[in-house]
Structure formats: structure tokens, C-alpha cells
């Protein structure tokens, strides 16, 4: 992005901002997610990204050392942060601490769009092992969330 102003196009798209694949790791399980990098400035040492999860879709269940700061811009859904399952609506804020399992899911009838700020330099996400999943699924609310029954 070289221009100082990128005009809003339609449906949460911006002129001159590419819609990118969500992940490039074939092992990461997700459904119906796109990513746009809105700001990447080395002097700020952060990136502001827009993710959109299609109706009924979900992001990868993952954890990492860096934090996420999330603002829901569009739609409704649910998120898992640690063992906390919460409903999401427009303008809700979600803070994801380091090394915390997290995932976002869109409601069936509408997309879930959110801004996510992260450090420019960050570690790669870790996917859960079978043991990690078993531990998470020991909590009935988390197990229901992971099955998509929230």
C-alpha cells in the first residue's frame, strides 16, 4: 500500500488492498476466511488487518506468543479465548493474551468481519496436538464450541 488514502470499496473492501488467503499452512484447519492487510508500517512495528469469516465459517484454533487486539466490525459470531466461550456482536472488543488457544466462528446467517492488530514481527502459530484438543474438550462449553454447536 503506497497511497496515503485507500477509499472504501464495497462490502468491507478497500481500493488498493488485496484480499489474501487466510493461511498458507495446509495443516491449519479453517473454513471461509479471508485476510486484508490494511496497514503495515515498520515505524509503528504493528500491522492492522481485516479478517472476514464467511457465514458458518471459522478461523484456525491456534496459540502463539504474540497478542491479538480485535474489534468486531461486522456481523455476529462466537469466540474461544482460553476456555472462555463468548458471543460476539458488532463493536465488541476481544483481547487474546500470549499462548492462549483462540478461534473465531461466524454465525450461520452472516459473515463475521473484524480488525486485528498484531506486532509486525511475530512468531508462527502453534496448532493443537491431540493431547491439547483432549484437554480443551474436557470442558463441555469448549467441546460444544469446537463442534460448532454454540
What are these regions (language model features)?
Residues 1-45, 131-150:
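A short, N-terminal "cap"/entry segment at the start of jelly-roll beta-barrel domains
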Residues 49-64:
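Conserved short histidine dyad/triad with adjacent acidic residue
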Residues 57, 65-66, 84, 100-101, ...:
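A generic "binding-loop/recognition-motif" signal
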Residues 83-98:
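Short acidic-glycine-tyrosine-enriched beta hairpin
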Residues 50, 95, 110-127:
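A short hydrophobic beta-strand segment most commonly corresponding to one strand
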Residues 59-61, 79-80, 96, 102-108, ...:
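Short beta-strand His + acidic residue motifs that chelate non-heme Fe in jelly-roll/DSBH
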Residues 66-68, 72-77:
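Glycine- and acidic-residue-biased ligand/ion/polar-headgroup-sensing regions
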Amino acid at each position: 500500500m503506497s497511497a496515503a488514502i485507500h477509499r472504501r470499496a464495497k462490502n468491507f473492501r478497500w481500493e488498493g488492498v488485496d484480499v489474501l488467503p487466510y493461511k498458507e499452512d495446509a495443516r491449519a484447519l479453517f473454513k471461509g476466511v479471508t485476510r486484508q492487510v490494511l496497514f503495515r508500517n515498520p515505524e509503528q512495528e504493528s500491522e492492522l488487518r481485516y479478517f472476514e469469516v464467511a457465514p458458518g465459517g471459522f478461523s484456525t484454533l491456534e496459540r502463539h506468543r504474540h497478542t491479538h487486539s480485535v474489534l468486531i466490525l461486522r456481523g455476529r459470531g462466537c469466540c474461544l479465548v482460553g476456555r472462555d466461550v463468548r458471543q460476539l456482536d458488532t463493536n465488541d472488543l476481544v483481547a487474546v493474551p500470549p499462548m492462549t488457544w483462540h478461534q473465531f466462528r461466524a454465525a450461520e446467517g452472516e459473515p463475521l468481519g473484524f480488525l486485528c492488530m498484531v506486532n509486525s514481527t511475530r512468531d508462527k502459530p502453534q496448532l493443537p496436538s491431540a493431547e491439547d484438543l483432549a484437554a480443551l474438550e474436557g470442558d463441555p462449553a469448549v467441546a460444544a464450541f469446537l463442534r460448532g454447536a454454540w
